[in-house]
Amino acid sequence: MREFTLLRYLVFEGKAEAFAGLLYPLEKEKIPNTFSLTDNEKKALWLKIKPALQSDNWDILMEVMFGSKNYPNYGGYTLGVDIIQTAFKNHPEILKTNWTYLDAESFLKLSDYN
């Protein structure tokens, strides 16, 4: 079994939010974890967590995803959604495939976060 790393957690939740947004497009604006950071805050958080993307330390995963004194609230969710959305923007053809099967590393390469 593969480890559940920070990168996999980001993409896992990003996929879930993207799928929900496709099913219920009007509801996605009501979910704070999809837009809780500005572009500058996303960049800063990404630079901070990038060295830990392969970490499977549950404490780090929880802090990044949900927030703590070291990380903004819902920051990991926001980045996860952004990774998926920028992959869709950069490669709209993947929406015509079963994109839910793409792994985290593939989404990262297709996104603006590579």
Put a short name on every predicted segment.
Residues 34-35, 46-114:
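Pan-zinc metallopeptidase signature
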Residues 2-45:
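Post-HExxH zinc-binding segment in Zn-dependent metallohydrolases
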